[in-house]
Amino acid sequence: MDFRQAQRNLELIEEVAKNSQDSDEPIIDEDDLKEGKVEEEGEGTQIPSMPFSDDDDSDNNSKDTFKETPLELVDKEEAIEDKAPNDDEPVVSVEEKIATQEPEPEEQIFMNTQIQGQLDDIEQEDNLRSKLSNFKYASEESSSVQVIKRSNERKLKSKKITKPKLTKTSKRTKTNSNPSTQQTLDEIKISRSENILKLLSGKHGKVKDMINHQRNVEKKVKLVKNKNSNIITYDTYNSEEWLRIMKLILEKFPSANDMEVKQVYHYIYGEEQEQEYDNLWEASQIPLASMREEAYNEDNQIDRKIPNIPNSTQTRVEVMSLSQVMDDVSIIEESKKTTIDSEREMHIYEVPDSTDDEDSRIIRVISGSDEVASIVAESEFSTETESTSTQFFTADGNMVDGVIDLTQGSFKAVTKLFSPLKVDTLLSINKNKEKVQVAVTRTSTRFSNLGSGPVGLEETPRLAPDEAATPPTVISRSPQSTRTPQATRLPNPNITVMYEVNKCELQSSNSYQSRSSEDIRIVNQYDIDVRDSQDEYDSATEKCLIEFAVTNSATPSVQPEDVMNVISSQSVQKLRQDLKTIGLKPVRTKAKMIEALMAASQVLDTDNVDQEQTREALYDQLTSMIKQIPELVSKISRFEPITMEELVLQLIEVNPFADHIDESTIKEWADIQGITLRNN
């Protein structure tokens, strides 16, 4: 709106107000009446045309009420122009009146501010209406109509949506209601699992193939089970029982032919083709194919030769004793035995067997000759062409023929036992055969070129740890003293062990005295001829004696005082790390740390730097402690849960050192041992 037009409208309003005051009965046209009615109807929304007041108090009210005057002013201006020809007054234009009338400066400022405020309000309303016109509810009439239309549309949409749903559900109910599910399942014979698989996968063809395949497999399994149920189960007998059965058959049926005996044999041991048994014990008792070939001739006849006595050498089972297996021995077959002269210096001992109290000859190789080394190498690196089955010999040296020996069929550990003495050690012995070295240790000692005496040089007496601290004294130096070989500990460590040595190839006695003058003393030395038998050794008066004095090598190398000094000299951080490494309880003070480590040094070998070794030693100590408590052992064997408090208390009763062990370490050990622990 233009500023001039607004000012003109205001002047017209003033004129209309003056005319209304001058005339008692103002002439009102029909248009004016219509406009008045509209103003009365829209009092809430439209502002009546009121003249501006000069008072400042009425300014605020005029701002609120005067809003839509410009539209009305235009209409009134047209009405005044229409009424102008009827009046007698001369027509004066509005512009002339505005030019003639000059308002005061104060009124002019006030009018300008009021007009500008009204103009701003009008522009704001126009902008707001333009924005509201973009919405659906621009007016009350349009909004009510639109609400009705939308409600009708919603009803139509809901009707359209619900109708297809009803039709769909009705179709589904029709399909499900036609035949009952139980009848269809009974008619088609569909199992519950098959139905579930169909529902889950939806691939009916694949499911049918899978189920048919499974049914065929089950049918085959049933047929195999039925066949196996008709098969006769066979009992297993050892060789003595089988010989007893054969003897009874031949006594009761002397006219029985070999085929009948064969049928009895197959009834006991089963057919040759039926060797695949589910039971491992039955499979282990089946005779070997080689034994069956030896038992039967080419005409499928059984050797009917029966021994007269049951305790014959043919039925005797040869079993190696534990001492034969663990000792440094080698079994040499009779076909491969080589005759070695006494100059080869080989000691032969007779070790009693644990089953039949008969002696088996075991050869111990001590010499360092190349020939013996080659024999050991051949026995160690045996070729694959040799027989893989273990050979057992009787006293007569013949294999058991015609008798099923369970030991040959079920035990296939090794082909032969040979000496673990390596070729490298033999060669080193051969190089140093001119020198004799005696190690000052508690372990066994070997000699390379010393004579064949009745004493095993490996059987050096070992000292008891409790008695090793006492100093040794020489009891006997008799040249004729001999002793029997016994690998036992001496009850008294204060003994000087005397060894008889024949044919001493000693270059000088100073070499031995220089090595260890305290432990080895040359008593006497003579030139002795080599004898051919043990009797000549006993009758010989000239002997070379070497005296081996038992020393205090069993005493601990580190005294407890030294250990205490070493531990106390370490820092607190190092002590704490040692406690963590061993698996002991963490403590705060250094004195308690030293106490715990001292207790561990008395029980464990704390010299090991490796954490795994220290933990394993601690676990072994706990295991040895738990074995001393029968009640806990019985609970552990029955897998009964044990409380941590109970376990620790009982371990402390056995050994107070358990009080220093951390609970986490005990839990790890219990987990390894399979002990079930529960909280207190």
Swiss-Prot record:
It holds the Pfam family Slx4. One of its GO terms (cellular component) is endonuclease complex. Residues 15-92, 141-183, 450-490 are annotated as: Disordered. Residues 22-33 have a biased composition (Acidic residues). It is found in: Nucleus. Residues 156-174 have a biased composition (Basic residues). The keyword ATP-binding does not apply. InterPro entries: Slx4_ascomycetes, Structure-sp_endonuc_su_Slx4. Residues 473-490 have a biased composition (Polar residues). Phosphorylated in response to DNA damage. It comes from the Eukaryota. Its main location: nucleus. Keywords: DNA damage, DNA recombination, DNA repair, Nucleus, Phosphoprotein. GO terms for biological process: DNA-templated DNA replication; double-strand break repair via break-induced replication; double-strand break repair via single-strand annealing, removal of nonhomologous ends; interstrand cross-link repair; regulation of DNA damage checkpoint; regulation of DNA double-strand break processing; regulation of meiotic DNA double-strand break formation involved in reciprocal meiotic recombination. GO terms for molecular function: 5'-flap endonuclease activity. The keyword Cell wall biogenesis/degradation does not apply. Residues 60-86 have a biased composition (Basic and acidic residues). Belongs to the SLX4 family. Regulatory subunit of the SLX1-SLX4 structure-specific endonuclease that resolves DNA secondary structures generated during DNA repair and recombination. Has endonuclease activity towards branched DNA substrates, introducing single-strand cuts in duplex DNA close to junctions with ss-DNA. Forms a heterodimer with SLX1. This is Structure-specific endonuclease subunit SLX4. The gene is SLX4.
